[in-house]
């Protein structure tokens, strides 16, 4: 199964994400590199969208933490194969069927530009993707169905419109970006989609001083029970990620709107 037990989360993941140590940010740096590769591959396929990229990152986190691969030591080719395989599985699980040759050709183009001395052919890349796909599916327990946190943000759009003068679409877009960035962390392996959504809104509320947004109102809109301890826990983890980022206010449209 994709989701983790509370015991696994407490014993292995939570300490890594909450303790003040360099390992968290070192690991995050390498995960960002994986994310960048996935973004590039995703941008080159015709059905490119944020949903596919987010699902890909979920699969990567599960595979990464199940197999304990060392992101520092794996080869650039292995990174490409892992990213391509995660994207390939994600396209299928989101009902976007593409040929594996599409992924293979994108990876080959990257190799030609970034690894020109690497001697490898298309058939070998294809075989490696199929092998890695099976390994990733094993780490997922062959369960690829996963609910993403984006839907709940759309659901509360009317709430945004009722309590603030800020364009609801600006809020929606910003929430989507916060959620998308949160996939750099493995929080999606434990916390529910609605809880992640509310946590991201809570971070956004604090960062942009959106005093009109009441988190309790959002909790009441959720069809699932929201555990307040888990909400604070998830919020703290996401906030830690954004506190580390220097470009937290890079969304100038929102920042300008709020300041006015």
Model region roles, listed by residue range:
Residues 26-198, 202-232:
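Structured all-alpha helical bundle cores of eukaryotic regulatory proteins
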Residues 5, 14-15, 61, 144, ...:
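Intrinsically disordered, low-complexity regions enriched in small/polar residues
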Residues 8, 14-18, 175, 240, ...:
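Short linear sequence elements within intrinsically disordered, low-complexity coil regions
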Residues 1-50, 260:
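A eukaryotic "domain-start" boundary segment
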Residues 218-260:
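Long alpha-helical rod scaffolds of large eukaryotic non-enzymatic complex subunits
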């Amino acid at each position: 199964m994709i989701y983790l037990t509370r015991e696994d989360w407490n014993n292995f993941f939570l300490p890594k994400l909450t303790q003040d140590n360099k390992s968290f940010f070192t690991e995050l740096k390498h995960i960002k590199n994986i994310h960048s590769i996935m973004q590039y591959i995703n941008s080159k396929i015709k059905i490119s969208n944020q949903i596919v990229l987010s699902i890909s990152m979920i699969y990567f986190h599960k595979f990464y933490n199940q197999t304990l691969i060392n992101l520092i030591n794996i080869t650039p080719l292995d990174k490409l194969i892992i990213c391509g395989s995660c994207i390939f599985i994600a396209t299928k699980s989101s009902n976007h069927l593409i040929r594996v040759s599409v992924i293979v050709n994108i990876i080959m183009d990257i190799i030609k530009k970034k690894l020109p001395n690497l001697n490898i052919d298309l058939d070998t890349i294809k075989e490696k993707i199929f092998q890695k796909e099976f390994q990733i599916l094993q780490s997922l327990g062959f369960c690829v169905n996963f609910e993403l946190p984006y839907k709940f943000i759309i659901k509360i759009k009317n709430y945004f419109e009722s309590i603030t003068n800020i364009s609801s679409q600006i809020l929606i877009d910003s929430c989507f970006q916060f959620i998308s960035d949160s996939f750099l962390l493995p929080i999606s392996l434990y916390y529910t989609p609605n809880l992640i959504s509310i946590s991201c809104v809570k971070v956004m509320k604090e960062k942009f001083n959106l005093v009109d947004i009441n988190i309790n109102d959002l909790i009441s809109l959720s069809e699932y029970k929201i555990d307040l301890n888990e909400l604070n826990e998830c919020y703290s983890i996401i906030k830690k990620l954004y506190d580390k980022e220097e470009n937290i206010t890079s969304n100038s449209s929102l920042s300008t709107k709020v300041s006015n």
